[in-house]
């Protein structure tokens, strides 16, 4: 009986964690659309084009490398590989992180919103 109780407790904990992660992704998607969606999409194999590049598979990718998109020399030569650690300061103030970027975005000032957007982007793979 004790094992059954532990099993059920473990299942509930797993469900709560999965549910919380799904909520974070959902919040991140909403924030992505609000802050980034005017210029970017994050869609697998999409031919749809907006002002900015498709951000599907962004985490782990080198900055300035989406084929067919014209990047500034600053972006192409930044040497940045996108991760939570590089995205957070970039989403705070892109022009401070990559001086000379052509991205016209003032940044996301709230840390919890940046975190949610980064978690959403990390899941788009």
Map each language-model feature to its residues:
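Sec/Tat signal peptide C-region and signal peptidase I cleavage site
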Residues: 16-24
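Periplasmic/extracellular electron-transfer cofactor-ligation site
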Residues: 23-70, 75-81, 89-101, 123-125
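Bacterial N-terminal signal peptides that target proteins for export
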Residues: 1-8
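Pocket-edge structural micro-motifs
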Residues: 59, 84, 107
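Cleavable N-terminal signal peptides
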Residues: 9-10, 20
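Short, exposed beta-strand-loop hairpins at the edges of beta-sheets
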Residues: 106-111, 116-124
